[in-house]
Structure formats: C-alpha cells, structure tokens
A protein has these predicted regions:
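Intrinsically disordered, low-complexity terminal tails/loops enriched in metal-binding residues
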Residues: 1-228
C-alpha cells in the first residue's frame, strides 16, 4: 500500500562551487525518529546554508518504494539533526539534501538497516497509464521519449484543480531507481507552469513522485517509468 508523507517546502539538488573538503551524513533510527549526523573531513560540523527556508531536506523511502517521506529535520546539537518519522519493521533508504558552506557535498543513498535484517528492493512494473487520481485530483503525465543521456521533458496536466505556489514553484518531483541508488530532485522550468526537465544517466525503471499543493495541502502522485 502506498504511503506518502511530506512537509511544506521544496528543495533542489545543490552542488557547491567550493573545491575543498567533503561532508558525510549518517543516519540511525531511534525512539521513533531519524537521527542524522553531519561531519566534514576535519571532524567538524559544517555550517549549512539555508536552502528554500530549511537547513536540511530529507527524502526517505522504503526499499520496496511503497513508502515515501519528505521531511525537514531540526538541528538538535552541533552535529546532529532529528525528525520523527513512523518507520515500520522494514528496510529504508534516506537521501539528504544540504548545502554546506565552503565544502563539497554529494547526495548519496544512506541505508537504514537497523529496522530489519531483510533488504527487499523494488520490483517495479511500468505504469500502463500515466493518469493518476489522488485526493480527488486528476493529474496526467505527458513525458518525452525516455532515452538515457538525453534531456527529458515532463509535463503534468492537472485536470480538475489549480495548483498553488509551493515556496516559489508549482510543484516538485523526486525520482529514484528500483535499486534505490539513483536520486533526482527536479523543479519546474518556470514559476508559472508544471513543466519539468531532467536527464537519466542509466537505463532502467524508476519511480517518480510528483508533489502539488491544492488549497493548502500537498498531494503526491506516484508513477513508474522506464528509461531505455
């Protein structure tokens, strides 16, 4: 059963222009929440720059890709951030989006394996229809040919509602491959439409979650696509 959870914000993938230093993030699940430890290559806590009003943007998915959480941990100490999340006895992967000041950082999958010894990954089946109804809203995905290393255009046609600005954009999209290793976080080409562009480095099946805000609430529309 699909589960989608979110908080109201949006995030981009960030790549610092700095060339010095690396930052690593680790995660553990404890007492009903995720603890995230952030440390640079000198063993120090890097200063994080606000990105879209938050210091940290966190995507958590179950490894079978049936659960999706969009969260924003709070800083609780110099190195530590924490957020409550209702994870079950399953295996999960986290992707942490931050912008350390003066340091390089690359988003990597963080396995959260202390919940379950089993590590069951998704066996995705390509959607036959790209029309999805969630919370009474109908959204159709019109996507250009899915060719690896080529620019892909995704147009989301919202049939029976008008999306609201979602911190400067009309939505955002998270894309993860079925091995839960590749991560894309995409936002519209302009503030006035729901057209997104991206590129895939590897062929295969991917799950896509599109988030749109209607009347103050965010709805999540899941799709499975295949890149050749």
């Amino acid at each position: 059963m699909e589960q989608h959870h979110h908080q109201h914000t949006e995030a981009h993938l960030h790549h610092s222009n700095a060339v010095d230093g690396n930052v690593e993030v680790s995660a553990t699940f404890q007492n009903g929440g995720l603890n995230l430890h952030v440390m640079d290559d000198e063993g120090l806590a890097p200063k994080l720059e606000l990105t879209h009003e938050k210091l940290m943007h966190l995507i958590v998915v179950s490894n079978d890709l049936n659960e999706f959480y969009h969260l924003h941990p709070k800083q609780v100490s110099e190195h530590e951030y924490r957020v409550d999340v209702p994870l079950s006895n399953s295996s999960y992967t986290a992707f942490v989006d931050i912008l350390p000041v003066g340091k390089n950082y690359h988003i990597k999958p963080i396995r959260i394996n202390n919940l379950s010894e089993q590590n069951t990954f998704a066996n995705l089946k390509k959607d036959n229809s790209l029309k999805k109804e969630v919370d009474g809203k109908m959204v159709e995905l019109d996507i250009s040919p899915l060719k690896v290393l080529e620019e892909i255009t995704m147009k989301f046609q919202i049939k029976n509602a008008v999306p609201e600005p979602y911190l400067g954009a009309l939505g955002h999209v998270v894309i993860i491959d079925q091995k839960v290793e590749q991560f894309l976080h995409v936002h519209p080409e302009s503030e006035n439409d729901t057209v997104f562009k991206t590129q895939f480095d590897e062929p295969g099946r991917y799950k896509l979650w599109a988030e749109f805000k209607f009347k103050g609430e965010v709805s999540v529309f899941p799709y499975v696509i295949e890149v050749e």
